[in-house]
């Protein structure tokens, strides 16, 4: 098993972890159905940018 040769400082640890933060998902409301969905994704009803693209 690998063991580090020198201890990493709190600063180095923090700099490494600075990119680990989670961001909230970007949500949109569809103009036609008023449904909330992920950006650039089809709604559950099959609408994308106000047009029906999937028939259920």
Swiss-Prot record:
InterPro entries: Ribosomal_bL32 (IPR002677), Ribosomal_bL32_bact (IPR044957), Ribosomal_zn-bd (IPR011332). GO terms for biological process: translation. This is Large ribosomal subunit protein bL32. Residues 7-16 have a biased composition (Basic residues). It holds the Pfam family Ribosomal_L32p. The gene is rpmF. The keyword Signal does not apply. Residues 1-21 are annotated as: Disordered. One of its GO terms (cellular component) is cytosolic large ribosomal subunit. It comes from the Bacteria. Belongs to the bacterial ribosomal protein bL32 family. GO terms for molecular function: structural constituent of ribosome. The keyword Ribonucleoprotein applies. Keywords: Ribonucleoprotein, Ribosomal protein.
């Amino acid at each position: 098993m690998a063991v580090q040769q020198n201890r990493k400082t709190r600063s180095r640890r923090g700099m490494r972890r600075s990119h680990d933060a989670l961001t909230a998902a970007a949500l949109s409301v569809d103009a036609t159905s008023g449904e909330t969905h992920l950006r650039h994704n089809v709604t559950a009803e099959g609408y994308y940018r106000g047009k029906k693209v999937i028939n259920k």
